[in-house]
Amino acid sequence: MKNLLSLLLLFTVINIFGQTPTPTQPIETSPTAISDVVSTKTISPVKKVPLDEALILIYDYDGTLFTFDLESETIAWTVKATDAYTEMCANKVTLIDGVLYVPFINGEIFAIDNQTGTIFWKSRIGNSTDQTVLKDQLPIIQEGKLFITAQNGNLYALNIKDGSLLWNYKLDSTNNDIPVLFFDNKVFTQSGSSFYSFEANTGKVLYQKSFEEPMSGKPVTDGENVFIANEKDVLFALNPNTPDVIWQFKLAENQHNVRERILCKDKKIYFAAQGPEASSIYALDSKTGTQLWKTDFKDDTIEYIIEESDNIWGYTRKAKLFQLDITNGEIAAETKLTTQPISNFEFPVDDSLFYYSDAALIQFDLKTKDENEVYLRTSIKDNAYSAYLKIIRP
C-alpha cells in the first residue's frame, strides 16, 4: 500500500509539472502572422452572365463596391466585405464572362454577378480581422484559375468556379502588393529581392532569381520576354524560360519607383519613374533596351499612366491630366484639374474619360475640358488611398 501511494504521488507530480501552464491573458500574435489557410463558401455555381452595359462599377475608397447606372443615374447594387478593420479599397477588380472577381483588404475574394450583385462564392485568405491581407491586388484570371498574392507571403491559385484553393506557394517576403503576370502558361511574380516563375497548372517553381535590390515593379511582357523594375533605378529584361538577364536599363539620376506605372505595346515598353526634382515617362525598344524617348514633368510626380488609342494618358500628384503621343512622347494635351484623381481612367465610347476623386465620379470632357460630376459622395474622407473604376462592357 505504501508503494502504491508513493507511485500515485509521483504520477501526480509529473502530471502537474509536465503540463504547459495556461496563460492568464491571450498571447499577442505577430502583426504579420496571417494564416495561410483559404476557406470557401459556395452560394451558387458560377455561370456566364450577360453584361449590363449601362453600368459602371465603382470600388469606392471606403471599401464599398457598387454599380452606378449611367442612364438612370442611380445605384444598381452594393456589396461590402463581411468585415474590415478600416475603410479602404486598395484593390482592383477583374471582369470575366459577366462575373466580377473582387478582392477585399480583409482577405476575402468574391465572385459577383455584374447585373444584380448576387454573390456566387466567397473565399477568404486567413482569418484576420485587424490586418490588411490583400493590398493593391488585381486578380489575374487565366484558364479557369485566379492568381493573387497576399500579405502573408503567399501566392495563391484559386478555382474560379467555386473559389476553392488549387495551390499556393510561400514567397520570400510577407509584403506582396503587386499583381502577378500570366504568360506562356507560367505565372511570374516578385517578392522581396526575388523574382519567380511558376508552372501555372501545378505551382511548381520553374526558377527563382535573386537580385541585389528589392523587386517592387509590376512584371509585364511584350509577348517574348518579361520586364520588371527594381525598387531603385533599374529595369530588367528577363528570359521567360530561364533566369537570364537579357538587358538592363538604368534610369536617370535620382529617379526610381516604377511599380505599376509600366506597360508594353508593339514591342515597346513605356514606364514612369518618380524623383525629387522631376518625374519622367520613358519609351524603350523591348528587344534591345534602347531608349526611344523620354518626357519630363518637372517639380511634379506622375501617379498613374495608361495607354489608350496610341496615346499615353495619366495624371500627376498636382492634379495635372496629360496626354502624350506614344510615338515620340510629345505632350498632346495637358490640363490642370480642379479635382485630384485617385483612381484609374476609364474611357467610354465618346470623347471623355472617367476618374474618381475623393468627392465624386468625374466625367472629363476631352474637348471642352469640363469636369462633370456624375455621382457625388455624401461625405469626403481625408487621405483617401485609392479607388477603382470599371465600365461594364466586353
Could you tell me what each predicted segment is?
Residues 39-64, 83-109, 123, 129-156, ...:
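Repeat-blade elements of multi-bladed beta-propeller folds
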Residues 15-17, 142, 327, 332, ...:
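Residues marking helix boundaries in flexible regions
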Residues 70-73, 113-117, 159-163, 199-203, ...:
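Short loop/turn segments that connect beta-strands within beta-propeller blades
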Residues 358-374:
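Short cationic/low-complexity microdomains
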